[in-house]
Design a protein with these regions (language model features):
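Ubiquitin system architectures
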Residues: 1-86
Length: 86
């Protein structure tokens, strides 16, 4: 079975009532994904989210480790990744 190059996932921040469909590199590290998400949220909300530096990403029922990649975390097309304040 070939590994996918990209993964289509929905990133949801329910606290701010926003969900973003994203096509992401399968080997993207969770730490880099957090930075990308925070950048998007800051652009939408005009510089807010400075207190979210220590946010966490949740997939299924577990908090994702910063050193994992999307692929190693078991995230596949159609996955929902939740953003939460930690």
């Amino acid at each position: 079975m070939n590994e996918p190059e990209n993964i289509l996932a929905t990133v949801e921040c329910s606290e701010k009532k926003i969900a973003i469909d994203m096509e992401l590199p399968a080997k993207l590290q969770i730490e880099d994904l957090k930075m990308k998400i925070l950048e998007i949220l800051r652009n939408i909300y005009a510089g807010l989210f400075t207190d979210w530096e220590s946010c966490c990403l949740i997939y299924g029922n577990r908090i994702l480790n910063d050193s994992e990649t999307l692929l190693s975390a078991g995230i596949y097309d159609g996955g929902y990744i939740y953003v939460a304040r930690s």
